[in-house]
Amino acid sequence: MKTLTRMQLGALGEQLAVEHLSGQGLQILTRNWRCRYGELDVIACEAATRTVVFVEVKTRTGDGYGGLAQAVTEGKVRRLRRLAGLWLAGQDRGWAAVRLDVIGVRIGRSANPEITHLMGVG
């Protein structure tokens, strides 16, 4: 596999995360939603439970920056909540529940990328 730029690596990680979420039965509502305060990587929904799921994707090639749990700081969770609130404020549809998830994608250690899905982080 050729060396990827940070942007290419991030895009590949997000694509693998979207495929994982779709495989879990979630419907992808939007990707890379941006506002002046930041970006939400993936917004999905569980139709059966009417739950909207905001997903932060962390793509790594190794453990140099710590594991997935270290990548999701209290500040990061606060930022995700704020962004989720802003997205929800612009929607006409009501949701029964809201969930924040983090998906870690590790590329390069083996032939198949490793995906870790932490549900309900905040």
Swiss-Prot record:
Q: Per its UniProt entry, which superkingdom is the organism in?
A: Bacteria
What CDD domains does this protein map onto? PoNe_Nuclease
**Which Gene Ontology MF annotations are present?**
nucleic acid binding
Q: Which residues span the membrane?
A: none
Annotated PANTHER family? UPF0102 PROTEIN YRAN (PTHR34039:SF1)
Concerning its family, UniProt says:
Belongs to the UPF0102 family.
Query: What is this protein called in UniProt?
Result: UPF0102 protein MMAR_1812
Query: Species name for this entry?
Result: Mycobacterium marinum (strain ATCC BAA-535 / M)
Phylogenetic placement of the source organism: Bacteria, Bacillati, Actinomycetota, Actinomycetes, Mycobacteriales
